[in-house]
Design a protein with these regions (language model features):
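Extreme N-terminal leader/targeting segments of oxidoreductases
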Residues: 1-35, 53-54, 552-576
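Core beta-strand elements of the Rossmann-like FAD/NAD(P) dinucleotide-binding domain
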Residues: 31, 310-319
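Dinucleotide-binding Rossmann-like beta1-alpha1 core, especially the glycine-rich loop
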Residues: 80-176
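Conserved beta-strand-loop-beta-strand element in the redox core of flavoprotein oxidoreductases
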Residues: 294-314
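Active-site/ligand-binding neighborhood in enzyme catalytic cores
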Residues: 173-298
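N-terminal Rossmann-like FAD-binding beta1-loop-alpha1 element of flavoenzymes
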Residues: 32-60
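Glycine-rich FAD pyrophosphate-binding loop
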Residues: 52-78
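C-terminal segments that line or cap access tunnels to active or ligand-binding sites in enzymes
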Residues: 251-262, 305, 317-319, 324-492, ...
Length: 576
């Protein structure tokens, strides 16, 4: 196995810059401080943040809107009087307790309306709900008891757990828990050398499970929460997120809660303050203009051509951070770029899937649960959040036409499975069919015991992510999501490239979690910034890069497993 394929996230970051072979390379000058960042999602804004704080002159080019997939945006023609337009979004934002890089950045962004930080405006989440269909008991999950658990909640949770576990074949549950233990006690060598190359489905022995077990133990983690397919994604990538979630839920490694949500629509609470702070540091933003091609000269990027409705020009800088999503980065790999760094051809092998959202604006408050709701049995892998309960503003008084009191935001993780109303996958449905289908799938879980939760009259309007375009009977997606598959770590790039002044940032770049997350995007933005610092000869301190939580109690098991892996032996518990 190559050294590249065995690099871990901590190796991949570094501050070293690979030199290209066979090409003359111009050396940087001591005053080379100009940086162009292409893309203003979390990765690009993070790189701009870290570099601007260290005295670099940063210009950010963004083809659509600041914030990328993480932004919120106004619903067109939804306001009346002095109110704002209703909030829409690509998908609701949730910051799990095991995130480290993103919370650190949020603590360094001043809010716009007080003397606190953006992080101070995050609302703790201590529980979530597995909503079941066909009369099965919903399963509330509590990460910790202090301050949030009522006697009624504990009674319901205990009864639901007992019913669910009675329905699960004990042998299958033991197998699943054993497989989790195998992963959590596996060495880094085995994770990257063995578990990277088998699917999560095969790793947990999903083919031996009942359909009920697969829904609860496999699909609920993969499709519903991270838009990954258990039969395609590697055991290493899914296992990494699974163990991180376990450590957060048990408070072994957490920022204080199992997760947090914002106290207002995302851009108002986070993206707008972030952009304002970056502007105060001298960052310049050019919106509506995207990169078309990099130009190469003497082994370095000499310019990037950017275009927009009224713009078509070359932009020169000393350093370039490409922070666009992988499907956009692939378009920038011209023959000249690949000649300068042939390893970047691997980007063509990376894949994307669809995970987009729809918001239902309701006439009545509908706090279904004071945390995310995972519709385990929904074929489209739905997860919802009733957001008005967490926002520090009056939705009815401040937004829309004065009748909307709730924003029920729903993420759709599976666009390929047939629905329950039209029998078609989401990617084949018209927007109104998607809205009807999503409501039906939620009602199948929320109203399966006879109670009415989502009556027809309560829905004032709905808004589908505008990245989904339905034209001439065909759906397209302008903002798909990077997904892992077995062996994809080997073809994921590092933040530093063999082109000395080109750096990559985005959730497809190697990082700790190995999944499409805001945390991973933030980490790669830091890694790209550190690459610029190293290559420019800057004496500024590097951006902090955190290591994943590694329980000391498991260290001896992992050392033993590393020795067994080097000798070609299986994990000591890998007998099931």
């Amino acid at each position: 196995m190559s050294q590249r394929s065995r690099q871990t996230p901590s190796d991949a970051g570094g501050r070293g810059v690979l030199e290209p072979t066979g090409l003359p390379v111009a050396a940087p000058t001591p005053t080379a401080r100009r940086v162009v960042v292409i893309g203003a999602g979390v990765a690009g804004l993070t790189a701009a943040h870290e570099l601007a704080e260290r005295g670099f002159e940063v210009t950010v080019y963004e083809r659509k809107a600041l914030g990328g997939k993480s932004r919120s945006f106004p619903v067109p023609n939804s306001a009346s009087g002095e109110r704002r337009e209703l909030p829409g979004e690509h998908g609701h934002r949730f910051v799990p307790g095991f995130y480290q890089h993103l919370p650190d950045t949020m603590t360094r962004i001043p809010s716009l309306d007080d003397h606190r930080s953006v992080w101070d405006h995050m609302v703790p989440q201590a529980r979530f709900l597995y909503a079941r269909s066909d009369g099965r008991e919903d399963l509330p999950v509590l990460s910790h008891i202090k301050g949030v658990a009522t006697r009624e909640f504990l009674r319901r949770a205990s009864e639901a757990l007992l019913r669910h576990f009675k329905a699960l074949p004990p042998a299958q549950l033991v197998t699943f828990l054993t497989r989790l233990l195998v992963f959590m006690t596996s060495s880094e060598e085995r994770r990257f050398g063995e578990w990277e190359y088998i699917t999560w489905w095969d790793f947990v022995r999903a083919e031996r499970m009942s359909e009920e077990n697969r829904r609860l133990l496999v699909n609920a983690v993969t499709e519903h929460l991270i838009a990954a397919r258990g039969d395609l994604a590697s055991a290493r990538s899914i296992g990494t997120l699974a163990e991180a979630s376990i450590y957060a839920l048990t408070r072994l490694s957490t920022t204080g809660e199992s997760g947090r949500v914002l106290d207002a629509p995302t851009s108002e609470s986070w993206i707008d303050p972030w952009v304002a702070y970056l502007r105060s540091k001298g960052v310049r933003f050019v919106v509506g203009v995207g990169a078309q091609a990099f130009e190469i000269g003497r082994g370095r990027i000499s310019a990037v051509r950017v275009t927009g409705p009224t713009v078509n020009q070359r932009v020169e800088a000393d350093w370039y951070v490409c922070a666009v999503p992988v499907e956009r980065a692939q378009m920038l790999l011209t023959a000249d770029v690949l000649t300068a760094d042939p390893s970047l051809a691997c980007l063509a092998q990376l894949r994307t899937e669809w995970m987009n959202g729809i918001q239902f604006h309701l006439r009545q408050p509908l706090p279904l649960f004071d945390g995310p709701v995972n519709y385990v049995d929904s074929p489209w892998g739905l997860v919802s959040a009733s957001q008005a309960q967490w926002w520090n503003r009056d939705l009815q008084a401040g937004y829309g036409d004065g009748t909307v009191r709730e924003c029920l935001s729903v993420n759709i993780a599976n666009f390929d499975a047939p629905g329950i109303v039209y029998g078609k996958p989401a990617c084949k449905c018209a927007p109104d069919e998607i809205a009807i289908e999503v409501l039906a799938q939620m009602r199948a879980a929320l109203e399966d015991t006879g109670r009415i939760m989502l009556s027809d009259g309560v829905v004032a309007s709905w808004f589908l992510d505008p990245a989904l375009r339905f034209e001439n009977g065909v759906m397209s997606n302008d903002e798909p999501l990077f997904v892992n598959y077995t062996g994809s770590w080997d073809v994921r790039p590092t933040a530093t490239t063999a082109i000395p002044n080109l750096f990559l940032a985005g959730d497809y770049v190697r990082e700790n979690l190995s999944a499409a997350t805001m945390e991973g995007a933030n980490q790669t933005g830091r890694l790209a910034a550190n690459g610029v610092l190293e290559a420019s000869g800057s004496v500024a301190s590097p951006s902090r890069v955190f290591l994943p939580y590694d329980p000391p109690a498991l260290a001896a098991f992992k050392r033993r497993d590393a020795d067994r892996f080097r000798r070609g032996l299986p994990h000591v518990l890998d007998r099931i």
